[in-house]
C-alpha cells in the first residue's frame, strides 16, 4: 500500500460538548416534570352486556394522585374479590370453642425451642466412655416357633406367644465376653441391622426377640460408667422397632381409595390393623421380665392411637407405675427418661404423666445414697463423684420435659420439693440445667443459698455454680443482687485447685462479669485467670476455654480504647503460646475492631496494641501458608490501616505508613493498600493547600511520592506494579512533581516488556494482552497532559512507549497491537490541537509549552505516519481466507478513527478512508446494519458547519448488496 500522510482535524471541544447536550425546554408552571407525581385519570364506561349476562358498571370519572404502577389495575385484586364473595360466617369472630381448640393445638406440638434428644445423644456418647471390658448376649437367630398359621382358639394364641418368647430364653443366645467399647458398639449395631433384616424378611417374632434381648441389657450395670452410652445405643434399636411396627400397622390402613390422614381417629382404622396392633401388645404383655416388657411396650406407645383415643393417656400412668418395680436407681431414672422421651413425642399435651415421673423420682432419690448403691460402687471401685454425674443426662431430660412451657407455680413447687431433700446437689444441677433461664436468674440468691447448703462430697459445688452461670449468661438477675452473686460465685471458683475445673467455671462467669460490670471487675477476673493458668503452663490444655473468654470480652467491649486500657488484657493474650491458636485469637480481635470501630482513631493505646496484634498475624505467614489465609490476614490488616487517621498531622500519618511498611512487608495486598493510602495523603495535602504548595508541603508530597516509588518494585504482581506506577505518576503530576512523575512513567514503560503472555487469575491462566491493552489505553490518556522534559526530545515518553510496543512479542492471532496503535493515533491527534481536552491545574502541558509550534506538529505528524504505516501493513497481512473477518473489522475500526480524528479535506486521507470502506465490505464480511448506521452518521455530520466535505465522501461510500 502507498504511504498516506496524516492530517488531524482541528477540534473545538467546547462546541462539540455543547452540541452533544440535550436541548433544554423551558417549563411553564404546571407542565410535566419527571419528578412530579403521576396523575392518572381513570374513566369507567358502561359495559355492553352480553347475552346471558346481567352485569354492568356505572360510568364515572375520577382523578387522583396514585402510584404509577397501580394504574394497570382496574379494581380489586383477585384474592380480595374472592374473600369478599366468601361466606360471611367464615369471616366472623373466633368463637370460644375455636379458641380453646387453638390453645389445645399449641400444647399438642413441641416447638423449636425444645432441645431435641438427638443433640444430647451425641454429647452422651462422647462423654460417657470406658476402658473396661464389656459383655453382651448375642441372639443366634433360631427359627423354631416362627409364626406361620394362626391358632384357632385364644388359649392356643397365648400358648404360641409364650413358646415363641421362651425359645429365646432356652439357648438361642451366646454370651460374648471381654469386649472393648468399640467392639460392644459394633455388636449393638449388628443387632440393629439384624432387626431390620428380620423385619424385611417378614420374621416379626425374630425382630421382637432381638428387641427383648437388647432391652435386657439395660438391667446390667456391671460397667456402670458406660451405662448412659449403653442406654443411648439400645434405645436407638427400640426407636427403630417402634417405628417399624407403627409403619406396618399404618400401611394396613391404606386401601386403594385413600390413605390414613395425619390426624386420624380410631374410627379410620380397619379391623385387620386393629387386630394386628392388639396382637403386638399381647405379645409384649407376655414378656416375663419387667425391664424388657416396659421398654418394648414404651417403644410402641404411639400404636395406641390405632386402638382408642384414650389409649396413650391410659397407658402412660401404668408405665410410670411399672418403673416403681425397678430397684436400681440408675436403671430406674433412665427408664423414666425413656418414657418421658416417648411421651413428649407422641403426647406432649399429657403433662400429668411427665409430672408424675418427676415426683416419683424424688420419692426414690434417697436410694442413691443407700447401702445397696454404696456397696455396688465399692465393688466396682467407683467414687461417688464419678457416679453421680451418670444421672445427669436422664435427670436433665426429665426436668426439661417437665419444665417445658410449665406454669410458674409448677416450677416453684418442683424447686421447693428439691430443696427439702438432703444431699440434693445433683437435683439442683438438673433444675438449673433444665428450667428456664429467666426463672433461675430471678431466684439467683435462692439458688446460691441452696448451693451453699449442699454437701461437697456428693457433687462438686463448682459444677453447680457453672450451671448457675450458664443461666445468668442468658437472663439478667435483679440489679441489686448482681455484685453479691459474682462475689459468692468467685469465692468458690478461685479456690479450685484443678486448672481444668477452674477454667471451665471461669469461662462461664466471664460472660456474666462483662454483661453487668465495668473494666475494673473484668480486669480482676482476667488477672485471676492468669494467676491460675500460668503455673505449670496449664493454659496449654485449655486453649478453647481461653479463646472463649477472649471472644466474650470483645463481644461486650466495643470501645477499644476501654478494652486496651484493661491492664491484664494483653498479658492474657500472652498465654496463647501455640501459634495457630494465637493467630486465630488475633483474627477474632481484628474482626471485632473492623466491625465495631465507627470513627478513625489515633489513640496511641489502640494503635500500639493493634500493631502488635497485626504484627503477630503477619509473622505467622510462611511458605506453607495458603493463599486464602494470606488474603484473610491482609484484609484484616488493611481494615486496621484504613481506620487510622491523625487528622491534619500528615507527617505523623506518613510516619505510621512507613512503620507499617516495615512491619507488613510479606503481605502484598497490605503494601498495595499502603501505597494507595500514601497517594491519598498527598492528594489531601494538595486539597488543604488548594494546589498552592508551600516549601514544606512540597517537600512533604515529594516524600510521599518517594515512598511509593520505593515500595512499588517490591510487589510481585506485574499489572499491580504497572497500575500503581501510573496512579502514583498521576498523583505526582497533580502535585507539580514533574521529574518524579516522569520517573514513574519511565518505570512503567520499562516494565511493559516483562509482561508475560499469560497471568494467573483465581487459579486459572488467562491471556495477558487484554489487560495490557486496558493499561496502555489508560496510560495514553495520562500522556496527553504530561509535558515534555526540556532535556529530552519532543514526545520522548510516547516514542519510548512506541518502541516498547513495537518490540513486544504479540500473539499472531491477536489484533491488540493494532488496537493499541489506533489508540496512539487518537493520542497524537489530541496532542496536535491548539488547546487540549483537559489539563492538570498548575501544570503546563505541551499545548502551552509549544503553542502550536510547527516543529512540534511536524514531529507529531511523522509519528502519526509511522503508526499508520504499521496499521496498514497489518491489514495487508490479513488478506487470507481465515483472517478476512478480522481484516473487515479492523478496516472499519480504522475508518471510524480517521472519521473521528482525521481531516478528510485532505485528498489522500479522504481516499484512504474510501479504500478502507471498500476493504471492510470486500469479502462480504461486514455487518450491513453497522455500515448503514455509519453512513447515516456521516450524512448527519455533513450538515454541521465546516463539514460539507463529508457530503462528497458519503457519495463515494457505496453499501454492499446481498446477491
From Swiss-Prot:
The chain crosses the membrane at residues 699-719. One of its GO terms (cellular component) is endosome. GO terms for biological process: endocytic recycling; Golgi to plasma membrane transport; protein transport. InterPro entries: VPS35L. It is found in: Membrane; Endosome. Residues 43-112 are annotated as: Disordered. Disruption phenotype: Homozygous VPS35L knockout is embryonic lethal at an early stage of embryo development, between 7.5 and 10.5 dpc. Residues 51-72 have a biased composition (Low complexity). Component of the heterotrimeric retriever complex formed by VPS26C, VPS29 and VPS35L. Interacts with VPS29. Interacts with COMMD1, CCDC93 and CCDC22; associates with the CCC (COMMD/CCDC22/CCDC93) complex which contains at least COMMD1 (and possibly other COMM domain-containing proteins), CCDC22 and CCDC93. Interacts with WASHC1, WASHC2A and WASHC2C. Interacts with SNX17 and SNX31. This is VPS35 endosomal protein-sorting factor-like. It comes from Mus musculus. The gene is Vps35l.
